[in-house]
Amino acid sequence: MKKTHKDTCGTSFHGDTIFISVEELINLLGEPQFQENDGNDKVNYYWDCETEDGELFTIYDWKEYRPISDFEKIEFHIGSFTKEISEKVKSKN
């Protein structure tokens, strides 16, 4: 998986999450497209990504409502166009 600049608008949560830290995600994907780690919004971080096959997905924290430490492992949501894509992403992590 890699970060993408393709349009991920329309992806949604299909029940799949990954348990990982912000630091691990930055090492894996680079800096997030959105970073507002103040806990005031539903999302502090998100990445737009694609699989090796070009399937689009997003990774984001959801409703933590607090600043997140770079080293703290939390559940990040996977947003995608289908359940199959989000399951594929989850299985690779």
Residue ranges and their predicted role:
Residues M1-N93:
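Residues within mature, well-folded domains
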